[in-house]
Amino acid sequence: MFFIFAFNLWQGYLVFLFYKYKQKPAVVLPKILPQNLPVVTLQLPIYNEMYVVARLLNQVTLLNYPKNKLEIQLLDDSTDQTTEIAAKIIAEMRLKGIDVQHIRRTERTGYKAGALAEGLGASKGEFLAIFDADFLPQPDFLLEMLPMFYENEKIGLVQSRWGHINEADGWLTRLQAFFLNAHFTIEHLSRKQGGGFINFNGSGGIWRKTCIIDAGGWSADTLTEDLDLSYRAQLKGWAFGYMPQVTSPAELPANINALKSQQHRWNKGAAECVRKNLLNVLKNKQIGYKTKLHAIFHLGNSSIFLCITVGAICSLPLFVLSQKFVFLHVFFRLGSFFLCGFFLLIIFFWTSYEAKPKNFLRFFCRFVGFVSVSMGLSLYNSIAVLEGYLGIKTPFVRTPKFSQNKDINPSENLYLSQKFPVFSLLEFAFALYFALGIWLSFYFKDYSLLIFYVLLCGGFGVVSLKSVFQFLNKSAT
């Protein structure tokens, strides 16, 4: 409970930093003369992406950059027809004079990190731009991003803001966009301006090659190779840039089981980075206390799910006992005070809410939905966090992509798991467990945790049933 309260306080501090630096005039970056443009390698790591690889390759042909200074690497670890689809398009690209390399590996060693390392060794560029398969690099991306590197030779990375090409698909994609917009609007900017480390988000960014090499290169010992390299580079003294005015549109998971796969990787990888990098940050005497505090809450943010899960499970028996033992009743009153930290969370998300004009009722419904579904994912994510802290290794599981092709039925996606989501049965049991909490609140006429139990019951119920129904829908097709 204390960590949840402290985390919410820190989110409030990030809002303060956001408003503090919001009025700071943006630095006007000079354009680079065409003859001075550097050689850039565009890396596209893919693995079994037959639904989106054509869209990706067609999009990168639109990049506004001299052909003699742009190298494209398709880092293709695929084992299905993705490779054949890509090969045909690459042949057409080469006929247009585009320098594109189709790099294949005999073994998928190191997963995405291994593919990026392979490409790094063969790259021609001074800078390396990286995009995942579901992204749509905008034509002027390179021309808009590269000038920041010339502000300071110690800038090792410049990250763009993510956009969402399918936000309007349904409530699940809207809630993801709700969260990601807050991350890219407030967290990145506030950490950067407030003296904290920021991170490469895995896609939509440009690295200086010498920075990657100096930091030790790509490593596959965590599932979030992007976060890991980001911290190692900044510990080496490299600075990172962020350009929120440059948007890199991408596809959001529209399937709950695909989202859970992505969330597992992100949260476990963050916990692995705590094990690997946090102590190095705290021990570094060249780093100030503000940077260290930023790192604690940045790297440790996935632990919020563990705190929610443990607190929620323990709350019900303690709630029953509190009806008999007065000292426990006082504890719950104190716990209710800590929940006031959620008001700071409301302010945090309201600040980043991008609907124009802002409608508080619509915002609040989206906020409640986000909190409830996040609680519903907390058990699944908690296991991921525990695995990360305990050093339990699991494969890098890619997030299934769906494409925006209306001729393709999402339920027919071959990359979705063929196994029944057994874990959803446990999540549904949790929904029933917290439904009991709702009933007990009325039975004891003690409503101190009623809202908490409603959010938990609704979240676990929605997540579990959505997982099962989407699986059954796929099975039926």
Predicted feature locations:
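Acidic donor-binding segment of Leloir-type glycosyltransferases
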Residues: 58-103, 108
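Long helical/loop segments within the catalytic core of UDP-sugar-dependent glycosyltransferases
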Residues: 90-127, 139-223, 235, 256-296, ...
